[in-house]
């Protein structure tokens, strides 16, 4: 079942792509009772279920640990920090938000993303989208030397400032990094729920790094685990606030979205149908999506080795790749139920049919 406190711990941790250490620390603590951990040099974290037995097919449960953010490019003489985006951002979503500039020791400096005020903008500037190079981070330093003394430096990771909160009346979560820390938390919940159950498959969780910059971690996890099938958990961008109802396929509160296609993968139709049939049988709400954009770690997983049958369980996230997202714990719970049903019914014979 959904663990709200766990979601908050994992989502609040600092961890832009390449700097996921704090996230891994939380996952290690929360999952210590579920099996044994391994880690590689790219900061991928592997959790092998205690009950795994030789000779059974292996299922990789994938979710990425990194979040979108920024990195300090240089420090101006006036103490302002210029930066580059890490992951996909829409420039208009960046200014006037608070950020955390991470020091070497892991502590952070609060800052605000600044831009030229409208009072000083030309008419053309007011009508155009600002270039990210025109933005800067203000940490309150009045000189380059002061910024350095405060702990800022070239290549400092910069994390969106947001603390995960939960509204029990609406069952909605508000916070950062739902893409895909919700998946990380869901995997732990699933493995916890299945602790006492005998399965016909082995489970290995792959908490992958650097998804937001090109699914890099998943390329390693696929090779190391060499699974027979994979389930990729993702925070999928919700489309329910801007598309007409007949086009909406990722609605917050209506269950996880299982995509048939995106820009990098055509989902294995047999594994997909297996999952959808189980959802119908167990009355688990799900949504079906046909995406002509976007991609997930499944892009790397399904092409590994001789090919890995892979599906994506996408938890809807409004305003993904911004400081604040909105997701429903009902969708998280439905994702947990669906994953449990899939894993409880998988066998060597069924996998061979994919």
Predicted regions and their residues:
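N-terminal hydrophobic/helix-forming segments and targeting peptides
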Residues: 1-354
């Amino acid at each position: 079942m959904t663990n709200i406190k766990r979601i908050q711990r994992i989502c609040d941790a600092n961890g832009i792509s390449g700097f996921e250490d704090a996230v891994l620390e939380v996952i290690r603590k929360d999952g210590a009772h579920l099996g044994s951990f391994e880690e590689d040099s790219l900061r991928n974290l592997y959790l092998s279920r205690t009950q795994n037995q030789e000779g059974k097919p292996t299922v990789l449960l994938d979710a990425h640990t990194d979040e979108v953010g920024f990195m300090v490019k240089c420090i101006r003489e006036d103490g302002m920090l210029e930066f580059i985006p890490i992951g996909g951002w829409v420039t208009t979503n960046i200014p006037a938000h608070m950020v955390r500039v991470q020091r070497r020791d892991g502590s952070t400096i609060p800052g605000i993303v600044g831009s030229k005020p409208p009072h000083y903008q030309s008419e053309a500037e007011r009508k155009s989208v600002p270039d990210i190079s025109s933005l800067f981070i203000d940490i309150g330093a009045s000189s380059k030397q002061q910024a350095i003394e405060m702990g800022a430096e070239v290549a400092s990771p910069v994390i969106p400032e947001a603390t995960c909160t939960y509204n029990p009346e609406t069952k909605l979560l508000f916070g950062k990094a739902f893409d895909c820390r919700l998946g990380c938390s869901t995997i732990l919940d699933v493995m916890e729920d299945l602790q006492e159950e005998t399965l016909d498959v082995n489970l290995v969780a792959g908490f992958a790094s650097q998804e937001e910059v090109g699914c890099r971690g998943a390329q390693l996890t696929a090779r190391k685990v060499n699974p027979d099938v994979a389930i990729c958990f993702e925070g999928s961008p919700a489309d329910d606030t801007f598309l007409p109802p007949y086009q909406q396929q990722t609605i917050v509160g209506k269950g996880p979205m299982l995509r048939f296609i995106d820009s990098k993968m055509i989902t294995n139709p047999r594994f997909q149908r297996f999952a959808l049939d189980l959802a119908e049988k167990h009355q688990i709400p799900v949504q079906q999506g046909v995406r002509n954009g976007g991609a997930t770690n499944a892009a790397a997983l399904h092409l590994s080795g001789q090919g890995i049958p892979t599906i994506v369980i996408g938890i809807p996230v409004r305003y993904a790749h911004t400081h604040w997202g909105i997701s429903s714990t009902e969708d998280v719970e439905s994702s947990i139920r669906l994953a449990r049903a899939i894993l409880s019914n998988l066998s060597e014979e069924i996998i061979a049919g994919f």
